């Protein structure tokens, strides 16, 4: 089960002339395609919906929402998730990122992000079982393992 944070979902709208951004976008599109084909399971959350609604461009909002169409479930905010997020926030994770982590912990195998600061900070916290990874690296490792 895969949880993409909002940075991943917004990546297709970033400057594709930048090689890194282009590669990350292709990885994210591949992951979404494989979820749509049923090879992997995509997760959505109330936190993602809230963050997407804050996007000023309505067309972008609609497109991002469509990217989440293959999601098999929407993770609801609960007191447990909010308390877990507060713990992550106390460890230096930003509020929305902490909520994404807390949503993903009980439901996902991996949380993917292109936010380098969040990725580094989340990987440094060893009090949770969740794998937080970069989509390009994760896709490469996962496909390599699958085809080996």
Regions found by a protein language model. Give the residues of each.
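Acidic, PIN/NYN-like endoribonuclease modules and their adjacent C-terminal/linker elements
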Residues: 1, 15-25, 34, 90, ...
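Alpha-helix capping/helix-boundary segments
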Residues: 8, 48, 81, 99-100, ...
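Short beta-strand scaffold positions
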Residues: 4, 76, 95-98, 113
């Amino acid at each position: 089960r895969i949880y993409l944070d909002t940075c991943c979902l917004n990546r297709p709208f970033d400057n594709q002339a930048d090689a890194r951004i282009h590669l990350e976008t292709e990885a994210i599109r591949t992951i979404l395609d494989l979820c749509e084909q049923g090879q992997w399971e995509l997760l959505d959350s109330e936190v993602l919906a809230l963050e997407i609604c804050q996007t000023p461009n309505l067309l972008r909002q609609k497109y991002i929402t469509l990217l989440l169409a293959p999601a098999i479930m929407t993770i609801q905010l609960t007191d447990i998730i909010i308390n877990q997020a507060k713990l992550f926030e106390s460890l230096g994770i930003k509020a929305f990122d902490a909520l994404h982590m807390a949503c993903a912990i009980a439901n996902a195998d991996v949380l993917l992000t292109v936010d380098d600061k969040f990725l580094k900070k989340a990987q440094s916290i060893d009090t949770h079982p969740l794998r937080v990874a970069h989509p390009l690296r994760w896709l490469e490792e996962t496909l390599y393992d699958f085809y080996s």
